[in-house]
């Protein structure tokens, strides 16, 4: 999960609306804009942003530490998971679901992906959640 910023703040407002009917899971993956001198996985260059506070983890333990720090910002009934970072199994969730820095997925209880956002849009996702719950 990228460092939380103003673009990512809205999901946490949405969780309070649907907390009793939808489970919210955050997955901590690669840092899109790690703190220098680390490079972005998207550009291959240093690409810091104002919210770049973490280095790119090189071990699973470092990634878990970053996730704990970020998880402290997650409130309510939400789950924070950490993508794998081991030789031969690096970033399976990030690689499988899309290497986007701010994506979101609405997944039905049967495991079917209902809605995909390659760049999270709170209003659109909220609409998709309401539609899914109305079925």
Where are these regions (language model features)?
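Amphipathic, non-transmembrane alpha-helical secondary structure
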Residues: 2-5, 126, 130
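Thiol/disulfide oxidoreductase modules built on the thioredoxin-like
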Residues: 74-77, 82-128
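Structural microenvironment flanking redox-active thiols in thiol-disulfide oxidoreductases
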Residues: 1-74, 87-90
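Short, hydrophobic alpha-helical segments
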Residues: 133-134
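Short, surface-exposed linear patches
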Residues: 10-11, 46-50, 102-106, 128-130
